[in-house]
Structures are given as C-alpha cells and as structure tokens.
Amino acid sequence: MALARCVLAVILGALSVVARADPVSRSPLHRPHPSPPRSQHAHYLPSSRRPPRTPRFPLPLRIPAAQRPQVLSTGHTPPTIPRRCGAGESWGNATNLGVPCLHWDEVPPFLERSPPASWAELRGQPHNFCRSPDGSGRPWCFYRNAQGKVDWGYCDCGQGPALPVIRLVGGNSGHEGRVELYHAGQWGTICDDQWDNADADVICRQLGLSGIAKAWHQAHFGEGSGPILLDEVRCTGNELSIEQCPKSSWGEHNCGHKEDAGVSCVPLTDGVIRLAGGKSTHEGRLEVYYKGQWGTVCDDGWTEMNTYVACRLLGFKYGKQSSVNHFDGSNRPIWLDDVSCSGKEVSFIQCSRRQWGRHDCSHREDVGLTCYPDSDGHRLSPGFPIRLVDGENKKEGRVEVFVNGQWGTICDDGWTDKHAAVICRQLGYKGPARARTMAYFGEGKGPIHMDNVKCTGNEKALADCVKQDIGRHNCRHSEDAGVICDYLEKKASSSGNKEMLSSGCGLRLLHRRQKRIIGGNNSLRGAWPWQASLRLRSAHGDGRLLCGATLLSSCWVLTAAHCFKRYGNNSRSYAVRVGDYHTLVPEEFEQEIGVQQIVIHRNYRPDRSDYDIALVRLQGPGEQCARLSTHVLPACLPLWRERPQKTASNCHITGWGDTGRAYSRTLQQAAVPLLPKRFCKERYKGLFTGRMLCAGNLQEDNRVDSCQGDSGGPLMCEKPDESWVVYGVTSWGYGCGVKDTPGVYTRVPAFVPWIKSVTSL
C-alpha cells in the first residue's frame, strides 16, 4: 500500500511538471490571464486566430510606446508557428524580396495567383503587416509585382530595423499631401531641394500606393510645423524605401517650411491626365489614360478654359497652351478631339468631346501645356485666363480675368493704350490696341480682381504688369476697364464728306441691333449716327449734358425748346457734341462744336409744352461744320403733315437719359410703338395737342419710356426704303416708365415748313 502511494505521488508530480511546461496543451478557450476590458484598439475572439486590430498609419512602423495605441494580448501562439514577424513596434511589412506589403483593405477581390491560405479574416484590415492567417505556415502578405499586378510573397521575419514611418498630410485625399516622416519621436518634413518625380515614385511605393507619382514643391499642400528632417533627397526611382536613397543626414538642411516637399499618387483610372515629354513636371504634352494606355489630345477647338481645367486637375491654378514641338514626340494613340470644358469639371472626361479614339488629327496637333501655381499675392502666373465681354465683336470688350475660380474685372485707374496692347498681345492680336475706361462696355457683375495695374506695353501677358495684391481695389464696376484690339481708325476726309452728303440722309452705315432707355439697352457704336447732345460750356458748368439732339445736316441740329429754359438762349453758353458714344471717354469720331445760333419756335411758351421745338446752327465755314463719317450722319426729315402711324415702322428712341438706376454713360436705345392719337388724348386730356404724338410700351413688365436726360433727343422710325426719319423730339411725360403714361414727343411733320424756312434744307 505504501508502495502504491509512492508510485501515485511520482505520477502526479510528473503530470504537474508537464502541465507547467506545456501551456499549449490547455484548451484554446482557456486564458491564463484575466480578460482585459474591450478597447477601440483590440478586437476579441474566443481563440487566437484573429490578430489584434490596430489603428492605421500610412506605414505603421516603429512608433514610441508612449504614442502607440494599446495592444492587448489575445492568447498564446505556438512558438513553432510564427503568426507574425516581430511584435509591438517592430512588426514586419515587407516581403523577403524587400517589396512593401499592400494594406489588407486595398487587395482586390479577384487575384491571378491564389495565396497559400485563406485570408478572409484579414480582408478589410487597415494595415499592411505580415500575417499567417490560419497559423499553419510562414507569415506572408500581398504586394505589387514588377508588372504592376497584385501578387503575394512570404515575409522575412528577420528583416531588421523597421523603415521610417511616412504619412501624407494636407491633401484632398489619402493619395496626396505633404510628405512627413516620423523620426526621433516627432513628425517632420522633407525639403524640396532636388525633389522630383523619382523621389515621389519611391514615396508612393513605400506607402503601397499605385498610379501616377508626382512631386510637388514650395509647400504645395501647406507648410509643416515640425522639424525639417531631410534635404537633398536624390532617388533614382527604383528604391523600395526612402532609406535607400542618397540624402542628407537626419536634421541637416538649409530650408524653411515654404520648401516642404509633397507627392501625389494618383490611381490610374480612365480620364486621368498627365504632362509628358517636358523638361519639368509642370509642362509637356497633355496625355489622358484610357483602357490601360496613355494617349494624346488633339488641339481642335482648344480654348483657354480647357487649359485652365487641365492644369487645375493637375494641381495647378493656371496655364497656357504651348507648342507641342517643344516637347518630346509621341507615338501613342490620339484619344480625344474637339474637347470643350466649362470650368466646373472634376474629371477631364466630364468635358464635352468626341468619342474615345475619334479624331481627324495628327500628332502635330497634340495639345501641349505649361502650367503654373497660384498667385503669390503680388503677381499672377502667366497664362491665367482672360476674356473680352460685351463688345460688338470678339476683338473688343470689358476685360475679365479668371482668378480663384471666378471671372472678375479690372479697375481702370491708370488704364491706358499700353495696358490694351498687353491684353491684346496675350489674346493673340497683333494690330493697334486702344484702351477704354469708365465701363465703356458695360459694368461687370463679379469681383473686381485688380487695380492700379502698371504696364510698359512690352509685356507678354497681363500677369507681368500686376503690382498690387489681387483683390485689393478702391473701385466700383462703373470703372471697369476695356480694350479694342486690331483697332482701325476711320475718319472721313473732306471728299468723303461730299460723298456722304450726296448719298442722302437717314443712312446707317454700320451694323445695327434692336434691343431695348427704361427697358432699353446699350446701342452699338455708330448705330445712331445722327444722335447729338447739347452741352453747357465751361463758363456755366463742367460741359455736362443738358439735352439730346438730332443732326439734320453738317451745320443744323434739332432739339427741344425747353432745353434753353434754365440757361437762356445765348449761343456762347452751349456746345454740341456729335459722334459720341460714351459720355466720359473721348473717342476718335467724337466732335464738340460751338453754337453759332439758337432758333426757338416763336409760339413756344416756357409755361406750356406746346411748340416745344428749336433749331441750333453750329459754328463752321459755309456748310461745313461737323465732319461727316460713318459715326456722324444726318437724319431725314418727314413729309409735311405725314402720319407716321401709317407710313413708318420700327421706331426707336435714343439718348443718355435715366435707365431706371442712374443716368447712362453709354448711348441707350429702345424700341417703342407709336400710339393712336385718341389714346394719348384720353391719357393727357387738354395737355395733348395736334402738334404732339406719344409712344411707348405700356405693359407692366415691358415698359419703355424716354426720360429727363433724353429731352430734345430723337424719336426715329424706319421707312420701307430703309432710311431713318426723325418723327419726334422728346418733350415731356409723367415721370419715367410710369404705367399707362407714355412719353410725349413734338410731332416733327407739323413743323417741316418752319424747319426748312430756317435751315434752307
């Protein structure tokens, strides 16, 4: 019995030793330590098959314990099966070939080469550590092979010191940003000296990001705030990590954070663009990616807006089209033609275009671009878009520039023909250029981007002239600058005067458009060549506009008698201007002529509106007073007692009067219908006489009327022979554009005998 007890004690002691020496023999559900509470940094299973979840870093290697997320044990692993390379701060993340592992959540669902074991439990994990998912073999990971395809490989668990931690900061996505390294316990940046696309290739490879690697300079993604860790990085592009590249020692540099380096690793998808064949990263032949192949873009219909969109998508703010001959040749397919962008696209293939591969071009027509960064606050980069708006043709208009995503205007302070020469040169025009000020082509509606622009006239682009900060100004849109390119001055000679005089009256020698003073719109220059204005001479004022008038011949002007009520009929107090368009801008066809004689109808009384008509004789020898030209021509007189409602059509009023907001600086025009005599009598009762007529649109939403500044101006109607006849002189009315109160005009046909007796016309 004693012997049996001894044998039993020996057996139990042996089993106890074995149990203590082999904890693996316990049930896999047994935990030798108390289970810790759940944490956002750990994921728990009732077995050791799933590795702990860790927060994702771009390359999660070697982070000090104080800054590492807590990693808790999930159980014991047999020492004969290495489930992962290293532990804690030295986990492995490269194959035994030295190629970086892909993140588990970046592996596509379909693979050409199957891995050694199921990896379903790792699918979607936000890290790239080597693992043996089923615990049955060596740790492995996915990587991208030399052909760019996803493959798998075993990991080298003795890979030594971990690579530096890298992250991208300040970009719009995880594929771009300022490059930052983690070294000696803190994040820091890289100086952009020698920084190029080869360096970007290595960074993208080390991060496990595929696609187009592009280097960025001058703190493109913003300035960092930590130390500058590296300088003079000179990778060949074939290295597996930045550690393998020639570079400065850690912490050695001669830079500031304005030179922080950045990269973008753009995924290769259809519509991605790049610049190729240039001497730098910001210039080259424009190429677009489609179905696994790069191709070029034909320049048919290419515009500045297309350039802006392409450069913006490439990360720049502006650009200009460059000759493709400046860049290396291409034997790639021509993918796109007839591209037209609106400026709002977020992908190049959102621009209007032909179908992929449809074109009628050769590579001599490939689009070449040079892109530029944003303004630095003092000047704009060459090539930012400019345009001319609201001119009569594409060679003239209000100057607008595209800055920070918005079209805006330029203030006309100091604006001269030298500025116009630069604008026209940038737009490709080589002829004479003329500046226009005071919103000559109308007021813009966007921001005012520039003021106090200074040009010598020799600059290639407006950007070279800008001296004041973008957006700083002390102007309103009434001071918007404009230009006329390829300007041709056409003044009539004396022989030309005789030709025009002999050819008759009421001729419009320039193109016309019929738009609608209240309810009206700007006229074209020269569209109403008989339009004149009566002005005060400086002895009585500042030469300001008093009334409109109508040129009847080189020496006679028709206007309203009430225009002389305030300042009398002394001819030396007045001047007449003809050929005018913008009241504040001197123009080549404009003439200001003194007054020799004022003839007011003898029946006119200042306290009444009847007989409101006057004639003005201009100063000049014989019958040569105003020089006639395409912009200065006489109107025709009607027949005596002619009834314009039956013989005329297409009637217009013109002038610089009240537009509903203010007095206009540019000549206004408005189409108005002549109204029946009975209608006018009903509205104005005894105030309306047989020597008057009324006209105007009476609808609530379409009222057009002449106002105070247009007094004395013409009411013109077109005859069937296309000559224009003055049927009315703007006289009076109840306000401007008031409902059911049309403008009243002196009926010119009733005064034809008197006009001819005074003027001998």
Curated annotation (Swiss-Prot):
Glycans are attached at N93, N521, N569. Residues 1-21 form the signal peptide. It is found in: Secreted. Residues 166-267, 273-373, 386-487 form the SRCR domain. InterPro entries: Kringle, Kringle-like, Kringle_CS, Kringle_sf, Peptidase_S1_PA, Peptidase_S1_PA_chymotrypsin, Peptidase_S1A, SRCR. The keyword Membrane does not apply. Its main location: secreted. GO terms for biological process: exocytosis; proteolysis; zymogen activation. The record marks R516, I517 as: Reactive bond homolog. It comes from the Eukaryota. GO terms for cellular component: axon; cytoplasmic vesicle; dendrite; glutamatergic synapse; plasma membrane; presynapse; Schaffer collateral - CA1 synapse; synapse. One of its GO terms (molecular function) is serine-type endopeptidase activity. Pfam families: Kringle, SRCR, Trypsin. Residues 38-48 have a biased composition (Low complexity). Belongs to the peptidase S1 family. Plays a role in neuronal plasticity and the proteolytic action may subserve structural reorganizations associated with learning and memory operations. This is Neurotrypsin. The lineage of its organism: Eukaryota, Metazoa, Chordata, Craniata, Vertebrata. The gene is Prss12.
